[in-house]
């Protein structure tokens, strides 16, 4: 098997990024992402517009990925694609295209769970990229998900904690919207937080049993705080923006780290990885570095290009499924809610 070249063409279309990548034996040859700017004016992703943009982008993105990898279609060993979770209209574009390409080239089709792929991005073959060993804990943090996952093998994953309402990415974005920041607001909160005082304002941490999370009450607390303060001073947010952002970020990261500490204590697993769009946040990255020093954890943080939606992570998941000959048939359908 080691001498065989396994070229995986991967397709990702779960939300508003159209992405394609080519991996050879787990190493990235190309990783192309077409980001849809159309949603910014609406303050969030519009599913119908996302689906239409995927239809326009998918062919050129795949052509780019193959060209950059210097791979011909006939050299592709299998097609891996995101089956879910995500927006149904977006998923259907990638699923239909992957099935058609697989059928036309007469090569295997591999269906991938988007959230598993975020975790498996830690196993992309790169010389300077240390990988976790099994078992480890993975915290998936994004606009749609907040989970703590116990990972005992590539596809043996158990969700041991998750949000009971809103995801952490939504807490960042909605807080930003309340502050009058443009979409996507999460990265802007991170940017302003770096120059603010994280203890300037105090926000409540929701009390949730076990390893589960809740962020809906936190968003409400931010809203009421801003409404109350701007009533007294209409320019309050403008004057205190950096401190407010720092305090919001400090509280959210505190919620995440508290639950991770509890998960480490309950499982005895001290290897901890983060995955998903919010893992690009500088505060959570620093908090994990601090955790290594304070509590002796071994922490794994993905490269920035693998935090947001990308096809490289779909490709590495596809590669490990290919090794197991775990292929899908052509009756496979997209699933907007797809638990693992």
Curated annotation (Swiss-Prot):
Family designation: Belongs to the KAE1 / TsaD family.
Alphabetic keyword roster: Acyltransferase, Cytoplasm, Iron, Metal-binding, Transferase, tRNA processing
Keyword Lipid metabolism: no
Gene Ontology molecular function: any one: iron ion binding
Swiss-Prot/TrEMBL GO biological process terms: tRNA threonylcarbamoyladenosine modification
EC number from the UniProt entry: 2.3.1.234
GN (gene name): tsaD
Cofactor note: Binds 1 Fe(2+) ion per subunit.
PANTHER family: TRNA N6-ADENOSINE THREONYLCARBAMOYLTRANSFERASE (PTHR11735), TRNA N6-ADENOSINE THREONYLCARBAMOYLTRANSFERASE, MITOCHONDRIAL (PTHR11735:SF6)
Enzyme class, first EC level, given as a word: transferase
Catalytic reaction list: L-threonylcarbamoyladenylate + adenosine(37) in tRNA = N(6)-L-threonylcarbamoyladenosine(37) in tRNA + AMP + H(+)
Function: Required for the formation of a threonylcarbamoyl group on adenosine at position 37 (t(6)A37) in tRNAs that read codons beginning with adenine. Is involved in the transfer of the threonylcarbamoyl moiety of threonylcarbamoyl-AMP (TC-AMP) to the N6 group of A37, together with TsaE and TsaB. TsaD likely plays a direct catalytic role in this reaction.
Binding-site residues for substrate, renumbered to this chain: 140-144, 173, 186, 190, 281
InterPro entries recorded: ATPase_NBD, Gcp-like_dom, KAE1/TsaD, Peptidase_M22_CS, TsaD
Cofactors (names): Fe(2+)
Cross-referenced Pfam families: TsaD
Entry keyword annotation includes Transcription: no
UniProt xrefs under Gene3D superfamilies: 3.30.420.40
Subcellular location: Cytoplasm
Native organism: Christiangramia forsetii (strain DSM 17595 / CGMCC 1.15422 / KT0803) (Gramella forsetii)
GO CC terms of this entry: cytoplasm
UniProt binding sites for Fe cation: 114, 118, 309
Name the record gives this protein: tRNA N6-adenosine threonylcarbamoyltransferase
